[in-house]
A protein has these predicted regions:
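Helix-loop element at the rim of GNAT/NAT acetyltransferase active sites that forms part
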Residues: 22-41, 84-88
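A short helix-loop-beta-strand connector motif used in the catalytic cores of GNAT acetyltransferases and
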Residues: 5, 50-66, 76, 83-88, ...
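Active-site rim helix/loop that mediates acceptor-substrate recognition in acyltransferases
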Residues: 34-64, 69, 79, 122-123
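Conserved active-site alpha-helix within GNAT-family acetyltransferase domains
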Residues: 162-163, 175-199
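Conserved GNAT acetyl-CoA-binding A-motif
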Residues: 133, 161-174
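A short beta-loop-alpha structural element at the N-terminal edge
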Residues: 8-22
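Conserved acyl-donor/pantetheine-binding loop and adjacent beta-alpha core of acyl/acetyltransferases
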Residues: 35, 74-137, 191-214
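Conserved acetyl-CoA-binding loop-helix of GNAT-fold acetyltransferases
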Residues: 135-140, 145-159
């Protein structure tokens, strides 16, 4: 007798946009290590307008996938975005430019960290490809963690990238848990930034005593897909 899989995976449809955005803000942001270290607001119900709009655009581009339990409950989601060489700006925004765009001042530090962590233009050039899928955020509902769902979501996304003809995927992980999933699935390390060495404009961002001993660094990875 065939076993029924514990989770099923689906592209996020418009009817589920609000629920997966709720998952991101209430089951991811309050625990996201880099955001916490900047002192950026992570209280339940708080949303950063620009980031919410960015996630919504990813959803509208059909590059986000969700996991459902046997009871049809949405228990995880992975937000992704397709990146081409032509999409890349010639110069990444500075802190003041991010602020001018409407990003909260403290959260610009997280944006700058992500920019430093993964140079998508260089990654495309180094791997001699014109298209990649960036795994922007991986969310697992708090009461479903520790069941291997994060690894399954990344694995499913790699499979979907292959189906779409995308030759390269990247992921930037601020959490040690996602880093372990990436290594397990054969991703190659791209760049590591230890939180104790995280600086912006010559200023140290994180106090050593505030750094979680489990999550000590942000790491970016990439994986070449065999099409």
């Amino acid at each position: 007798m065939m076993e029924i899989p514990e989770f099923t995976f689906h592209v996020v449809e418009s009817a589920d946009y609000e629920e997966v955005l709720h998952l991101f803000w209430d089951h991811f942001m309050p625990w996201e290590p880099a955001t916490r270290l900047t002192g950026s607001c992570t209280k339940l119900g708080y949303r950063i307008y620009n980031l919410n709009s960015m996630l919504r655009k990813m959803l509208q581009n059909n590059t986000c996938w969700m996991a459902k339990s046997q009871h049809n409950e949405i228990v995880g989601v992975i937000f992704c975005t397709k990146i081409t060489k032509d999409d890349m700006p010639s110069k990444l925004p500075t802190k003041s430019e991010y602020i001018h765009q409407g990003w909260p001042t403290d959260f610009t530090l997280v944006m700058l960290l992500l920019d430093e962590l993964c140079d998508h233009q260089k990654l495309l050039c180094d791997n001699k490809v014109n298209l990649m899928l960036d795994l922007f955020a991986l969310v697992v509902k708090t009461n479903f963690r520790g069941q291997g769902l994060a690894t399954q979501l990344i694995k499913e996304t790699i499979k979907n990238a292959q189906t779409m003809g995308v030759p390269l995927v990247s992921i930037s992980c601020s959490s040690a848990f996602t880093q372990r999933c990436s290594i397990k699935l054969g991703f190659s390390e791209n760049k590591t930034i230890l939180y104790k060495n995280w600086h912006c404009d010559g200023q140290k961002i994180a106090n050593v005593e505030d750094i979680d001993p489990i999550h000590q660094a942000a790491v970016s990875y990439y994986k070449v897909i065999n099409l």
